[in-house]
Amino acid sequence: MKPGFSPRGGGFGGRGGFGDRGGRGGGRGGRGGFGGGRGGFGGGGRGRGGGGGGFRGRGGGGGRGGGFQSGGNRGRGGGRGGKRGNQSGKNVMVEPHRHEGVFICRGKEDALVTKNLVPGESVYGEKRVSISEGDDKIEYRAWNPFRSKLAAAILGGVDQIHIKPGAKVLYLGAASGTTVSHVSDIVGPDGLVYAVEFSHRSGRDLINLAKKRTNIIPVIEDARHPHKYRMLIAMVDVIFADVAQPDQTRIVALNAHTFLRNGGHFVISIKANCIDSTASAEAVFASEVKKMQQENMKPQEQLTLEPYERDHAVVVGVYRPPPKVKN
């Protein structure tokens, strides 16, 4: 066997790149080593059909691989990873996705994109593509489902994300702002994103992001204590949560009771291992849904994030729905 070759997996070390969480083949490796954060240098969805962190998603034709990266390893059945994206927009069409504010870039590879609120700026080194519409040039940013749970849910076919132009969103667990930047693109200049992050190190990145994007309001505070930042945040339409804590449903509920309007919606990303690493993922998801129901949060759909994330699910629902009027 060749050194550094793992049987099932695109690239070095199964899922993700050169070490990124180890994957099924490589040594454990820091969470991001050479792999540029989940799904890095060639590790596509769970090693099957990698193609450079595959950007192809379940929506696009073709295998799960065939990425938007340059080159990319072959993985199993994943086509070659495609050349560098079309910077100039030759032979590229952008069409609206059914979720308002989200678009699909159709070219040699299909990719999920959002309209860049700050043209000319990349947030985390993502590809950008400019499309000429009449005299104007509109710039779109590629949205990588291996680095964003929300993009993974959209490509997985989630029915509603409730995040749309003009919406006010409370984002719990904002980290460095990778997904937050795309949410900021979607809600546009008329919307707002309150981004809550406890880590000061990630918070610095978030504050720098907010300097350029005026619709992001960074809150460097613990989401367990919403009363500490209630003076900063108005009522919101949607809560998006990616906090990966054992008591995350309680954290979301506390914030919902404080900031979410009645009839507002929530989108929660659940990582089974973070809640109970001994139970099966399905059992964990079911128990979290039960907890939500006890908090006046009514789940409407649940979706696993395969092939982008292992043992993750997204639950979308409505908070304190108005009572149905009986005729």
UniProtKB/Swiss-Prot annotation:
There is a cross-link at residues 90, 108, 115, 137, 149, 164 (Glycyl lysine isopeptide (Lys-Gly) (interchain with G-Cter in SUMO2)). Residues 1-95 are annotated as: Disordered. It is found in: Nucleus, Nucleolus; Nucleus, Nucleoplasm. Pfam families: Fibrillarin. Its main location: nucleus. The modification Asymmetric dimethylarginine is found at residues 8, 15, 21, 24, 28, 31. The keyword rRNA-binding does not apply. Gene3D superfamilies: Phosphorylase Kinase, domain 1 (3.30.200.20), Vaccinia Virus protein VP39 (3.40.50.150). The modification N6-acetyllysine is found at residues 108, 127, 211-212. The modification Phosphoserine is found at residues 122, 130, 132. Keywords: Acetylation, Isopeptide bond, Methylation, Methyltransferase, Nucleus, Phosphoprotein, Ribonucleoprotein, RNA-binding, rRNA processing, S-adenosyl-L-methionine, Transferase, Ubl conjugation. GO terms for molecular function: ATPase binding; histone H2AQ104 methyltransferase activity; RNA binding; TFIID-class transcription factor complex binding; U6 snRNA 2'-O-ribose methyltransferase activity. S-adenosyl-L-methionine binds at residues 178-179, 197-198, 222-223, 242-245. It catalyses: L-glutaminyl-[histone H2A] + S-adenosyl-L-methionine = N(5)-methyl-L-glutaminyl-[histone H2A] + S-adenosyl-L-homocysteine + H(+); a ribonucleotide in rRNA + S-adenosyl-L-methionine = a 2'-O-methylribonucleotide in rRNA + S-adenosyl-L-homocysteine + H(+); a ribonucleotide in U6 snRNA + S-adenosyl-L-methionine = a 2'-O-methylribonucleotide in U6 snRNA + S-adenosyl-L-homocysteine + H(+). Belongs to the methyltransferase superfamily. Fibrillarin family. This is rRNA 2'-O-methyltransferase fibrillarin. The lineage of its organism: Eukaryota, Metazoa, Chordata, Craniata, Vertebrata.
